[in-house]
Amino acid sequence: MKKLALLFALVLTLSLTACGNSEQPTVTSALHESQAQVTESAAPECEAPDGAAYEISYSNAKVWTNSIGTSWVQTIVEITNTGTTNLYLDSGSYDLEDSSGALVASRSYVSTYPSVIAPGEKGIMYEETTLDDYSGDGNLTVIARPSVEEANVDLIRYNITDVSVSDDDFFGVNVLGRVENTTDEAATLVYVVAIFYDANNIPIGSAFTILPDELAVGSKVGFEFGGFSLPDDFTAANIANTVLYAYPTQYQF
């Protein structure tokens, strides 16, 4: 295991108003610094085997049928760091049950974003996938099994600016902006992730891209991406707030 280092994070939150609102998006950044010693937290709702304190603060499965008759499901699991140290989110798994308790689907190796979250911060396990041979009423319950550990990798975030979110006929939404490397190390395979929230601060979708080129020290590069298979009724007007993360690919062993 790598030694626990002081972790640095820069979280950029862009509040995006719905169409027709004349207010300009606001930008808020926050600096998180890890504590050298981990103190015991009081009564966490979930605790991983290594003592990582977290809770599943929201989960939902939304089912829809696309234009060619294929059933899709969007699964969202929100994970909140309730402890006092940074947490690493590895790929997780979940089951989907119908209203009778019957198993409809079981999924593994489900992506999580971002890979490291600070105390009080939220991440998500997220997937959009097809449901084979499904003909139910769409009322599904998520049985989530996130993989959460205390982080032994640094929490690194890159600055994001010039962001706009707009409708896209094919991808549902289009996210455009720039990412800047203000650290002293170049990075490859940099993730840029958008998590979309409604007016009640509930996550309603996500999209991401991976920068194809190295992000050199001091460089600022543009990005543009859309959703993979967001629900058919998803538009930019559904989004009250978008939180963006840019960070290097990190694996914890």
Indicate where each model-derived feature is located.
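Intrinsically disordered, low-complexity Pro/Gly/Ser/Thr-rich segments with frequent PxxP/GP/PP motifs
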Residues: 104-133, 205-232
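Short acidic/proline- and small/hydrophobic-mixed sequence motifs that coincide with surface turns
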Residues: 84-89, 103-104, 184-189, 203-204
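Low-complexity, acidic Ser/Thr/Pro/Gly-rich terminal tails and inter-domain linkers that flank the onset
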Residues: 43-72, 143-172
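Bacterial signal peptide processing site
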Residues: 20-22
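Asparagine-centered strand-capping/turn motif at beta-strand->loop junctions
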Residues: 79-84, 179-183
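Terminal connector regions
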Residues: 131-170, 229-253
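Positively charged n-region of N-terminal signal peptides that target proteins for export
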Residues: 1-5
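C-terminal motif of bacterial Sec signal peptides marking the signal peptidase cleavage site
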Residues: 15-18
